[in-house]
Amino acid sequence: MDQTKPPRRNPLAFTPWPVTLITAVVYLAFVIPLLVIHHVVPSAPTSSPDGLNITEAWNDLQVLTAGYRPYNSRQNDKIHDWLLHRINEILGAAPPATTDEKKPDVFVFDDTRSNLTFARDNLAVYFEGTNILVYIRGEDDDQEQWWELPEGSPKGKGGVLVNAHYDSVSTGYGATDDGVGVVTCLQLVKYFTTPKNAPRKGLVVLFNNGEEDFLNGARVYSQHPLSRFPHTFLNLEGAGAGGRAVLFRSSDAEVAASYMRSKHPFGSVLGSDGFKAGLIRSQTDYVVFEGDMGLRGLDVAFLEPRARYHTDQDDTRHTSKDSLWHMLSTAVATTEDLVSDTSDRFDGPARNDHKIASGTGHQAVWFDLYGSTFVLFRLHTLFALSVTLLVVAPIVLLLTSIILTKVDKMYLFRTSIRPEGSLEVLPLYGDRGVIRYPFLLGIPTAVTIGLAYLLTKFNPYIVHSSQYAVWSMMVSVWIFLAWFVSRVADFARPSAFHRVYTLTWTFVVMWVLQVIATVYQDRWALGGSYFIFFAYAGTFLATWISYLELFALPRKSEYANHLRPVSRHASSHSSRRGLSEEDEEDEDEAPTESTSLLGSRQRTTFANYVRVNADTADLSDSEEHTQDVNVYGLEQRWSASLPKWLWLLQFLLAAPIVLILVGPIALLLTGSLHQTGQDGSSSLFIYIAIVALTTLLLSPMLPFVHRCTYHIPLFMLAVFAGTLIYNLVAFPFSDSNRLKLFFIQEVDLDTGLNTASLTGVQPFVHDVAVGLPSAAGQNVTCGPFGDRFKCSWTGIPPHVLTEDKPVEEWLSFEVSRSIDKPRHAQLQISGQNTRACKVVFDSPIKNFHVAGSAYDPRFPHTYAKGIKEIRLWSRVWDNTWTVDVEWFNPDSSSDHSKTSGSLTGQVVCLWSDYNQPGTIPALDEVRQYGPAWIGVSKLADGLVEGRKSFEIA
């Protein structure tokens, strides 16, 4: 057959245009839907399902978010009363029982009795709750009202708890934090009191108050008798302002299985690992229910955008009915599955003393696929599969290599071959491309890391508003450099083994990553590395196919014998050249009209060396002009036997699985972290995370990128140039992506001096502070405050009392030292128009007691190293707290001993009600005169703190 006759074009061949088009189409086909799903919330139904009313829920949300409702505000009391009214309305409108369907019994508890003292590290809290509980009795529940008995306890299987908190921060309307959760709970009451939806197991719906100020409401719930009934829970939260509700924590696989009922699942176990590893520092009521009380449950929350979280943009204008429906539908589906479960999997020995006997489950791995399918399996299953594949995959590749060697088809790593019965050495060039991978991977990755440091130095917060500009910059330069390096390598040393060597290197790297991931799975129960396992499996299969592909090659001995019958001219020419590509050039043929303008088929490299197809050096003059059309370019002649379409199978094994699993993680991680720099988190971390994710997402194209045409890489170069300039010079904040600054005003009630301050990142916080009218002409002082800077100035005096009184009357306290007990004293503290005060000690105290307080061994109220601060919360206004304290012996060897027996500190009261204009003029001023690109949030529990000093001699 005439090898010079061009074959019919194969649309799947490993040639530039098919590779370019297929690679681009596959990446776009998987990435675009991910972006759409991440940013577009499923539409709410036009008509409400039976037992639910979306319009009613939206109207409730508008009422709920009419004002700021922190625990320490009058608006909070109004919402408490409104919730009781709405619950009674819903129960009154519930459909009546029928002959076939029984209406469940419902009990509403307005808990104005429970209180608790607890401590965490050197901070102690006394809290009086105003939680509202709705108990919908299940068909299988104990029919007695056991909670009314002095020692009453529930019988039978445990129930289900659904929780949302109805308080908000003092600077935010709390539409998603946690208004959507609250109205979802109201709809759950409506749904499960409909006779046909009556639960098998009892349901407790908790509207807790005080979450924003240290998870106080959830902790005090533990003191209600009904808290002993639920064994599982669903916590509804918000740490953003819209979008999809994300499942970001689950205690085990068994309870996570109930989430599978959700029509639009969304989330990854990687979020749970972030909490375990301490990367996410904020907490929700989940840690109280699961960690302190021993329940097993789920944490579902809105996570982005963080710029609106805890600000006045967390309102109904910036969320939607679609977001409301996403959380509501998820809650209904999950709760319905939990209350229908009659198995014993949520019953068993308590994990610790005094905790709920809910048994133990199995660590879980979960993630969603394109927002429609929920994948769930146990962590030990992932561990077993990981260990198995870590052992099996290298063995399979090793055995395949041995078989290839046995059948004389192992061309890999072979530079030459000596034909049998001959002293002549013939080149194979099978080692070409073996060391390319470190450069292919290392150069693009190193450059993107350099860009991460460049942005951190010159414009660290650009990711706050322009995360996709950062992504575009990283992706475009990575693609261009990977293509450029591979093309240079392919130009200088063309090799048909580029794919197999690159895949082999990738396999080795993935094997190392899988070892690390498996160790973390075993030691720290972190399942977020699941994507590494699947990527490793895909890489292994693609690599194995490359090795199996070698069986299509001729035996090396046969190939060598094919090369032997050459002319003496070729032999002498070959011996002159040896095996090096850098030997002298062939003598140029005489030019004719048909001669190429470049002269023969040789090419000159950048070092002025001749680029020659090595195999043509071993051919006779006649054979040299008969190039096999099945050989691509100047690659090795034996590559003509390799299949031309297997690359597509390898690409489909390696790339899509990475895009499907790593893509959502990249979007979720970016969405939840790109605006955390304003909170003091490292900007470099998010940039390095983007670099790592870019490398993971694009590395599957490395075995194939050298075949791509120049069109897309050059376009990527243009994109890189534009985005680099933008990312370096653009202002990082905007009206829709505001910088969050944190406000507090501190008043010295002994002297009347007040200091207003803003806390945030430099230089922006200073620029905002000095631009305020009241700060004009003042020396605005800025200094480090944790990971941020705090800028202070003398502010406009606040008006936090309902009537004008001297500041020294805002709070009062009396101190009396015990006569018969050394180092004991009693403080009586009262604040005007507030129900929150605290005592801050200059040195830690040993012990304390608040009159009327309850104690619970699950919540220790002391700390071995002493207590520095006691926070006091009352459900009534203008309350007087009585606090007995004991401090350390100054003569003891304790680290906290003082040189004298005195105790010093400050009594502080808080004011957080910002619903009336003019109450806190300094905050009004920041909002009125601050630039449009800032948002204001609270720095501490109170917007205004008034303090007086004390000394107990």
Curated annotation (Swiss-Prot):
Keywords: Glycoprotein, Hydrolase, Membrane, Metal-binding, Metalloprotease, Protease, Transmembrane, Transmembrane helix, Vacuole, Zinc
Residues spanning the membrane: 17-37, 383-403, 438-458, 465-485, 500-520, 525-545, 651-671, 685-705, 712-732
Topological region Vacuolar: 38-382, 459-464, 521-524, 672-684, 733-953
Pfam families named in the record: Peptidase_M28, PFF1_C, PFF1_TM
Biased composition regions of type Acidic residues, renumbered to the chain: 581-591
Listed EC numbers: 3.4.-.-
Name of the protein in question: Vacuolar membrane protease
InterPro entries per UniProt: Fxna-like_M28_dom, M28_fam, Peptidase_M28, PFF1_C, PFF1_TM
Source species of the chain: Emericella nidulans (strain FGSC A4 / ATCC 38163 / CBS 112.46 / NRRL 194 / M139) (Aspergillus nidulans)
